[in-house]
């Protein structure tokens, strides 16, 4: 249907590798790169288009993560995928997301890696430690009832994709403290798109991991020299050490999520006009305990927690529900914890 960037009939083919989980084979965490590239004219399929950073870097990272993590056994399944047709309209992602929905796959989330190899920005800044995590605030698939509830109980920045972004931020700071993950409160860059979006459109969690500083002279450009500027997405401009770091960011987060128990479901919260906050949630198979998190309403990260075991309800005494946001994560016997679940229901007084 897209006649603007699809000028003739073509097959859209993704390359997919699935590492099946030992306990939850139908629960998937996904890492993706893209296997297409482009030059200045998106319909020019004849000119040399190396796409070294956009997006051979993300694809190489995905393959390397698969090489390393395939040596281990995880409770949840991991999908490593090269998505096609990104530059022409996110076709590969649309196809896989639709397939996952139709087959009833339980998608924990997708980590879309699109450009993870550039450290020198068009603004002249050089930075080999900072990277961005883009995420939408709430699912586009939420119902009018869910949207209305947020007006009264909060959650405007606490959708499933934002929780995945917070998990990646926290895990990176824990295992790679030299890195500087930066959460960006946008679906993607201003007016632009990436292959996590089709998964968001189907109601799945999805984020984009990418370099902090883009260089537009090396992105979507015909290879040429003009006004003393070398244009083109060439291999010489990719910083391999930086791409390695962001690949490691993906690997530690894939492993942490794949080793963790499922996130709590049916999390309910109460505490209106009380000096305490109450919680109830469904028991999670394989969880040793649970972390109850809270944060200031203006804080981007979960900053405080208390740990509980052998219960599916708890009250935080001396805390007023109005002044904080709350969430609950499952903790496995191995110490790995799930992504935080934001409350979706109320405990009636």
Model-derived segments and their meaning:
Residues 67-91:
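Short helix-loop-beta-strand segments that form the rim/entrance of peptidase-like active sites
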Residues 304-311:
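Short beta-strand segments within Ig-like beta-sandwich modules, predominantly Fibronectin type-III
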Residues 116-136, 183-259:
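Active-site-adjacent mobile loop/cap segments within catalytic or ligand-binding domains
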Residues 83-194:
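Metal-dependent peptidase/peptidase-like ectodomains
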Residues 275-286:
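Conserved aromatic anchor
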Residues 333-349:
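Extracellular fibronectin type III
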Residues 1-48, 67:
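Soluble metallo-hydrolase cores and metallopeptidase-like ectodomains found primarily
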Residues 316-337:
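Beta-strand-rich modules
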